[in-house]
């Protein structure tokens, strides 16, 4: 079914039936179309077995990729975000095999200079308050503040099915103002409930022209993310992870 772009989860509750603690890789396979498939590992990631009934999610859309999957306690279901054209689509599943479409986000919000990619969705506390907010990361190419690739973000709420944005539709918030910052991803279950992010340090304006051998540009340093409030708005900030210092 073509090239593979993937993320993984640990199935602590054996919802997929591959065994408690199995590592499940959820990945986009790309050939004449893009579909979502899964593979599982029961030996701590040393080897993976493809699920026999792949793909688990298909679409007629040309761009249908980059799954972000996490467990949502409120509904006791898995949630998957997918980049579909210039929007993010949200699906849910009890077992990582059978997926239900829940909602879409993106039309009329933020920057739309090019295709949306590499979604992420997570909850963070707002510094100095008792409030928590959900952050939706959206990588955009082209259409960044200096052209080419960039990561924008949205602040809002999430109920397990739908993301509701607090921003006005015409407000665009950029995670980083450098040109070499794209395909941002974050890790769940980091120590002390931290949210750690890393990005690809390149830009599709010139990524294919950068001298390379076995890789295509470096990754950024890991950064801890947090939210702060100022002048009636809530914003995302980052700082180098303390392990680097």
Please provide the spans of the model-predicted regions.
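Structural motif
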Residues: 33-39, 87-90, 145-155, 221
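Aromatic- and carboxylate-enriched substrate-binding clefts and catalytic-loop regions
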Residues: 103-156, 171, 175
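Beta-rich accessory regions
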Residues: 128-130, 152-245
């Amino acid at each position: 079914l073509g090239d593979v772009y993937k993320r993984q989860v640990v199935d602590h509750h054996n919802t997929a039936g591959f065994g408690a603690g199995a590592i499940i890789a959820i990945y986009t396979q790309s050939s004449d179309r893009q579909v979502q498939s899964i593979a599982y590992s029961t030996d701590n990631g040393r080897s993976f077995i493809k699920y026999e009934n792949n793909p688990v999610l298909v679409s007629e859309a040309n761009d249908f990729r980059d799954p972000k999957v996490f467990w949502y306690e409120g509904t006791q279901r898995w949630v998957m975000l997918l980049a579909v054209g210039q929007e993010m689509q949200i699906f849910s599943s009890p077992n990582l095999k059978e997926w239900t479409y829940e909602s879409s986000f993106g039309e009329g919000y933020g920057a739309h200079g090019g295709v949306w990619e590499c979604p992420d969705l997570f909850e963070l506390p707002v510094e100095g308050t008792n409030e928590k907010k959900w952050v939706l990361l959206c990588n955009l190419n082209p259409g960044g503040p200096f052209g080419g690739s960039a990561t924008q973000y949205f602040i809002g709420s999430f109920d397990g099915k739908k993301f509701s944005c607090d921003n006005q539709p015409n407000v665009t918030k950029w995670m980083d103002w450098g040109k070499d910052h794209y395909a941002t991803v974050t890790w769940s279950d980091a120590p002390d409930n931290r949210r750690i992010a890393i990005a690809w340090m390149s830009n599709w304006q010139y990524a294919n022209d950068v001298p390379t051998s076995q890789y295509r540009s470096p990754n950024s340093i890991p950064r801890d993310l947090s939210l702060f409030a100022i002048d009636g708005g809530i914003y995302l900030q980052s700082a180098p992870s303390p392990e680097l210092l």
